[in-house]
C-alpha cells in the first residue's frame, strides 16, 4: 500500500495517529510532549474529524489523568500527552485506570526526572517509574515507527481492555524531523474493531444501566479480585502482535514484540529500546560489512514483557548479551530492562550466556556509533557506562576513533545560531522544503540548552538518497554556518568540516577585517583542508530589507540554499517565498514582502573569500573563555573547572571527577558574572540629555 510522504517530527506523527482513535483529549503542556497536545488542539479547532466522523473534544486542565479517568469511565476513547514529572503525577490514576480495565492511551515523549538537578531532556526515567502500574507499554525507535505503531497501542488497548503508555524518546524522536510515510484515516478505520469499541461504550457509567465503581474491599476478597485480571494480561501480547500483523500486511513491515537486526550468526547482541536502536543498526551495517558477527534485539512491547518472544528473537549463536538502559536506579542490582532480560532468559537455552549491563544517554547525552562499537568490543566490564568518562568508579568504556557510518552520499549540515534569532525555525522550513520537494530522505534535529532565548542553538540537517538512521549529533559536516560572529572565537566549529567542505560566516567584515578577527587556528584549518569560505552581512541586509538586525534567519536560509545546491537556486527561492507567505500571510502583505526581499538579498549577497596561502601559518590561539582569577574560592573553582568548559560547548569532555564537589546539584552563587557572551548587535550608550532617571539601566 502506497502512503503519502510527509516531513514531520515524532510528536506530530504520534498526534496524527492517535487523533484518529480519540473522542476526548485531556491536555496539559510539559516539555517535550507539548507539541502533541498543541497539534491535537489545533486540528480540533480546524474541524478535523477522527475515524468516527467527529472532531476531538479538547479539555485542558492540570489534572489531565483525572480527566482521562473520568472520560474513560463515561465511555469516551480518551488520550493524553505527557512526560517526566507530568507522568509521575499521573501514577495514582494509572493504577486505577488499569485496575478498572479502561482503554486509555498515554502518549509519552520520555524525559528525565529531576533528581540532583532538573533536566528537560530525554531518557527513560519517567516510563520506568510506571512499569508496575499495570499499564501496557509500547516503545518506538524512530519517527516512522511512531507513525506506524501508535495505532497498535490504541487498537490493542481497546480490544485488550488495558491502558497503554505509548512512548518514544523525548527530543531525539519527539523533536527530530524526518520524511516519513503517513497513515490515511480510512486505513486506520479499517483496522479498528468496532465491536470492541461498542462493548467499551456499553460498559460506561450510565444512569440507564447503573453500577458501582471505586468501592473498598476487605482482606477476604481483595487478593482474589486482583488476580482475576491475569487472563487479560496473558492474552494481551497476542492482541498486540495481531495488530502489528495488520500493520505489516498494510505497509509491508515486519513489526514484532521483539525485532532482531544484524548478522544471522551473531555472537554478541545488544538488547535496547528507543532511538538508540537506529544508531545501533547503522553501526551493525558498518561492522557486519567488516566481518563482525553482531546484532541487536529491539524491544517494542515492554509491558507485558514476553520472555518467550525475547528468546525467539535472539540468534542461537549468541555468546554474549549486552543490555542498554537509559536510566539510573541507584542501589539496584541493575537497571529495569537488564533485570527483565536476566529473569526472562533464566532457565532457557541462554541460561549460561553472559549478560552485561550498561547505562547510556541520560539527560539526552549523545550516543554515537563509536560508543556502540565500544559496547560490542567490551568483554570484561559486566557493568559499564558509555558517553562519559567515569574516572571515579571507572565504569566507562574507552572509545576508539570517531566513525563515519552514515550511508554514502548523505549530506551533513550544521548551523550555529542564537536562541530566538530564527535559525531553528528557518532550518525546520529548510528540511521540509527539501523533504517535500525532492526525492531525498531528510532529517533535522536541534540541539540547544534550557534557556528560553539567547542560548546557543545548533541545527543538524542530513539529507540523502538512502534512509537516515543517524540518531546522533553531526560532528563531521559538509556545510557549517555560523550565524553570530561572536561565536568564531568561542567555539570549535570550523574544525567539524570535512575536507573541501563549505563554511558560511555571518559577519560585517571585509578581507582586511577577517585577517584581524579570525583566530589563527580557524585560518589554518580553512587553508589546510581546502574549505570553501563565504561571508554574508545578515545584520546589514536585515536592516535594509526592513526585517531588523536580529531577524536574519530568512537571509541566511536563502544563502544556504544558494551554496548547498540541493535544489536549483530559482526553484529554492520560489519554495522559500511560498513558505514565507504560508507562515506570515496572516500578519499582512507588508511582512510577507519584507521576507521576500530578505530571501532575494540572501541569495544575491553571498561573498566568496579567496583564502590566502599565508593562512596555513596560522597559530592556535585557543578559545576565548572567561576565567575567574579573584573572588570566593568556590566560585573561582567552579567557573574554571566546569562553567568555562560548558560555555565553550566542551562540557561533554568533562569527567565525572569534575563534579564530585557538586554531586548534590548545588553550584556556587555569583557565577553568572562570568557568563557574558558578547552577542549584542548594538551596545547601548547613556545619553544624559535624554535621561529621565528611571533607573532601568541599573538592571541591564
Q: Model-predicted segments: where are they?
A:
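Conformationally flexible catalytic loops at phosphate/diphosphate-handling active centers
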Residues: 53, 164-259
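Active-site cofactor/cluster-binding pocket
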Residues: 4-7, 304-309, 317-320, 324-335, ...
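Iron-sulfur cluster-binding cysteine motifs and their immediate structural context
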Residues: 282, 670-672, 695-700
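Thiamine diphosphate
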Residues: 1-129, 134, 151, 171, 241-389, 460-462, 477-479, 502-553, ...
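Anionic-ligand anchoring segments at beta-strand to alpha-helix junctions in alpha/beta enzyme folds, i.e.
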Residues: 24-57, 250, 264-265, 269-300, ...
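Cysteine-centered iron-sulfur cluster-binding motifs in ferredoxin-type domains/subunits
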Residues: 18, 321, 683-700
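Conserved thiamine diphosphate
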Residues: 120-170, 194, 350-361, 528-530, ...
Amino acid at each position: 500500500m502506497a502512503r503519502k510522504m510527509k516531513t514531520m517530527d515524532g510528536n506530530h506523527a504520534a498526534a496524527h495517529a492517535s487523533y484518529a482513535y480519540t473522542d476526548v483529549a485531556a491536555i496539559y503542556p510539559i516539555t517535550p510532549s507539548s507539541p502533541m497536545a498543541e497539534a491535537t488542539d489545533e486540528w480540533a479547532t480546524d474541524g478535523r474529524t477522527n475515524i468516527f466522523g467527529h472532531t476531538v473534544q479538547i479539555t485542558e486542565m492540570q489534572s489531565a489523568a483525572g480527566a482521562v479517568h473520568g472520560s474513560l469511565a463515561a465511555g469516551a476513547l480518551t488520550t493524553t500527552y505527557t512526560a517526566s514529572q507530568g507522568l509521575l503525577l499521573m501514577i495514582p490514576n494509572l493504577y486505577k485506570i488499569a485496575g478498572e480495565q479502561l482503554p486509555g492511551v498515554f502518549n509519552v515523549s520520555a524525559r528525565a526526572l529531576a533528581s540532583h538537578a532538573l533536566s528537560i531532556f530525554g531518557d527513560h526515567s519517567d516510563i520506568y517509574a510506571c512499569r508496575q502500574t499495570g499499564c501496557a507499554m509500547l516503545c518506538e525507535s524512530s519517527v516512522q515507527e511512531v507513525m506506524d505503531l501508535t495505532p497498535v497501542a490504541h487498537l490493542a488497548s481497546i480490544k485488550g481492555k488495558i491502558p497503554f503508555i505509548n512512548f518514544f524518546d523525548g527530543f531525539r524522536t519527539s523533536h527530530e524531523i524526518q520524511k516519513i510515510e503517513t497513515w490515511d484515516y480510512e486505513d486506520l478505520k479499517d483496522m479498528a474493531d468496532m465491536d470492541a469499541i461498542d462493548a467499551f461504550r456499553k460498559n460506561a457509567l450510565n444512569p440507564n444501566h447503573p453500577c458501582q465503581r471505586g468501592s473498598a474491599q476487605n482482606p477476604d476478597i481483595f487478593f482474589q479480585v486482583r488476580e482475576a485480571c491475569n487472563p487479560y494480561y496473558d492474552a494481551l501480547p497476542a492482541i498486540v502482535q495481531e495488530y502489528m500483523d495488520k500493520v505489516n500486511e498494510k505497509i509491508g513491515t515486519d513489526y514484532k514484540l521483539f525485532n532482531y537486526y544484524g548478522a544471522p550468526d551473531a555472537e554478541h547482541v545488544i538488547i535496547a529500546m528507543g532511538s538508540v536502536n537506529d544508531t545501533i543498526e547503522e553501526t551493525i551495517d558498518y561492522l557486519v560489512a567488516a566481518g563482525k558477527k553482531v546484532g541487536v534485539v529491539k524491544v517494542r512491547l515492554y509491558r507485558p514483557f514476553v520472555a518467550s518472544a525475547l528468546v525467539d528473537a535472539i540468534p542461537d549463536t549468541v555468546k554474549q548479551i549486552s543490555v542498554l538502559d537509559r536510566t539510573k536506579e541507584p542501589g539496584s542490582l541493575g537497571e529495569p530492562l537488564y533485570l527483565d532480560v536476566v529473569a526472562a532468559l533464566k532457565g532457557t537455552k541462554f541460561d549460561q550466556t553472559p549478560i552485561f549491563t550498561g547505562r547510556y544517554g541520560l539527560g539526552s547525552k549523545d550516543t554515537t556509533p563509536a560508543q556502540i562499537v565500544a559496547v560490542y568490543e567490551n568483554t570484561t566490564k559486566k557493568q559499564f557506562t558509555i558517553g562519559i568518562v567515569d574516572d571515579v568508579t571507572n565504569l566507562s568504556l574507552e572509545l576508539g576513533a570517531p566513525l563515519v557510518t552514515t550511508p554514502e552520499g548523505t549530506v551533513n549540515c550544521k548551523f550555529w545560531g542564537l536562541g530566538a534569532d530564527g535559525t531553528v525555525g528557518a532550518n525546520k522550513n529548510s528540511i521540509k522544503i527539501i523533504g517535500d520537494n525532492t526525492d531525498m530522505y531528510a532529517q533535522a534535529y536541534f540541539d540547544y540548552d534550557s534557556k528560553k532565548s539567547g542560548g546557543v542553538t545548533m541545527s543538524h540537517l542530513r539529507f540523502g538518497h538512502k534512509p537516515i538512521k543517524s540518531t546522533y549529533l553531526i560532528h563531521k559536516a559538509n556545510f557549517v554556518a555560523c550565524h553570530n560572529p561572536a561565536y568564531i572565537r568561542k567555539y570549535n566549529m570550523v574544525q567539524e568540516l570535512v575536507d573541501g567542505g563549505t563554511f558560511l560566516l555571518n559577519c560585517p567584515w571585509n578581507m582586511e577585517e577577517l585577517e584581524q578577527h579570525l583566530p589563527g587556528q580557524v585560518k589554518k584549518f580553512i587553508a589546510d583542508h581546502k574549505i570553501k569560505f563565504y561571508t554574508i552581512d545578515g545584520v546589514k541586509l536585515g536592516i535594509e530589507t526592513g526585517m531588523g538586525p536580529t531577524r536574519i534567519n530568512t537571509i541566511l536560509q536563502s544563502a544556504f540554499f544558494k551554496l548547498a545546491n540541493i535544489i536549483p537556486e530559482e526553484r529554492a527561492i520560489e519554495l522559500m517565498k511560498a513558505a514565507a507567505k504560508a507562515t506570515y500571510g496572516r500578519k499582512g502583505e507588508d511582512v510577507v514582502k519584507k521576507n521576500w526581499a530578505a530571501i532575494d538579498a540572501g541569495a544575491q549577497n553571498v561573498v566568496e573569500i579567496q583564502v590566502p596561502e599565508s593562512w596555513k601559518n596560522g597559530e592556535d590561539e585557543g578559545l576565548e573563555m572567561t576565567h575567574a582569577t579573584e573572588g570566593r574560592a568556590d566560585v573561582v573553582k567552579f567557573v574554571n573547572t566546569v562553567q568555562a568548559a560548558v560555555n565553550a560547548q566542551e562540557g561533554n569532555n568533562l569527567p565525572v571527577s569534575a563534579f564530585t564537589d557538586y554531586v548534590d546539584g548545588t553550584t556556587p552563587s555569583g557565577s553568572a558574572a562570568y557568563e557574558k557572551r558578547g552577542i549584542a548587535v548594538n551596545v547601548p550608550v547613556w545619553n544624559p540629555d535624554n535621561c529621565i532617571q528611571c533607573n532601568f539601566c541599573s538592571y541591564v
